[in-house]
Amino acid sequence: MLTILKTGQSAHKVPPEKVQATYGRYRIQALLSVFLGYLAYYIVRNNFTLSTPYLKEQLDLSATQIGLLSSCMLIAYGISKGVMSSLADKASPKVFMACGLVLCAIVNVGLGFSSAFWIFAALVVFNGLFQGMGVGPSFITIANWFPRRERGRVGAFWNISHNVGGGIVAPIVGAAFAILGSEHWQSASYIVPACVAVIFALIVLVLGKGSPREEGLPSLEQMMPEEKIVLKTKNTAKAPENMSAWQIFNTYVLRSKNAWYISLVDVFVYMVRFGMISWLPIYLLTVKHFSKEQMSVAFLFFEWAAIPSTLLAGWLSDKLFKGRRMPLAMICMALIFVCLIGYWKSESLLMVTVFAATVGCLIYVPQFLASVQTMEIVPSFAVGSAVGLRGFMSYIFGASLGTSLFGVMVDKLGWYGGFYLLMGGIVCCILFCYLSHRGALELERQRQNALHNQDSLQLADAQ
């Protein structure tokens, strides 16, 4: 399969005098393609949530069955991010991403014609598995086309694609309901989003680009020697093209302490994020006595506050922090700790909403910065594998801690037990942010030493 998806190095070489102009144009196309592609993945993922009232009403599914379907997708997606992102290292990013979108669309068409619970469950699992084909190609593309000094801003732009994608699902499905009618709820909920996803898949194929070498250009490392990162591994002399996806994953990710540090950062970020977002509605309704309308407003602010903060964080990490991602992440987590206490203890409706919005504004920043850091601690050909480890750890462990364990703590100890759990997660996150930052500084020193040695050799040869 990967042989089919791999395009290989282009036989056509871009003339030297056109390299810079072509490179600039292609990398913008590459970024737009993964932005639109990842946006589309959310159209055929979040549409399931919008269909749940009809699953209960029309198919007579219980709340437990609907919850089980949601859990199946979450677990399948977490596993898939680990596996699919590693496989993406050996495939053409744009073809891999487009293929995943088409497969998700096919599954959604199947959902549009299904009525049995177990068929739904199987299709939801397949959808979760194919959803994992979106994130790896996105990070691989950014790592292939954009230098370290720009990845904060570029990564921030890409990161809001999931906010945009999640935001346009409701209008798409709503328009489909208005045209088709509620009697065709399965077509409106599943088949129409599937058709939209196929259109986006075609856009990815037409607009997207493979790696620079696949497009007849020099690699990023050849054009910008400062991008070379020295990694101490046993197999650095072995050509990546001759290594399997497992060998790359084992050599450059599993054995890398920095890859584990950043994965554990994500575990605790997801723990806090899912602990807030999963329990915010019931907490505000039952404990803070919000109305449903007031709760909806607080929930909206929690989600949409992330867009401006993520864009600002990308600029700050590039410009103010000079490409060092974790200091800003640690600052955000410390502020979240304070806001979480305010959210818990405040009795004012306004202040609870403000604290919830501030947590939402800040929590996506360390998640996004961890994504950018991932691209900078492993070679470009292992980015997908590192993203896969992060994805697996964050969803299987982080999301579970924030949802299931939080619920257990609330049942056993009350709400204060759940909040103590989240505060402990914040402290652990700051610790691993620090360890990841220290590891990144070590890699930076190695890179500078390598460049210094290279300059010394060139000077000696010239003399």
Residues covered by each model-derived region:
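Cytoplasmic membrane-interface "Motif A"-like loop-to-helix N-cap segments
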Residues: 90-101, 319-333
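Conserved MFS/SLC helix-loop-helix module at the cytosolic interface between two early adjacent transmembrane helices
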Residues: 79-118
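Glycine-rich segments within core transmembrane alpha-helices of 12-TM secondary carriers
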Residues: 153-171, 393-402
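Extracytoplasmic gate region of multi-pass secondary transporters
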Residues: 48-52, 252-311, 367, 371, ...
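Helix-to-loop junctions at the C-terminal end of transmembrane segments
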Residues: 80-92, 310-322, 410
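Helix-loop-helix hairpin linking two adjacent transmembrane segments in secondary transporters
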Residues: 158-212
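Cytoplasmic helix-loop-helix junction between adjacent transmembrane helices
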Residues: 123-161
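C-terminal transmembrane helical hairpin of 12-TM major facilitator-type secondary transporters
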Residues: 323-370
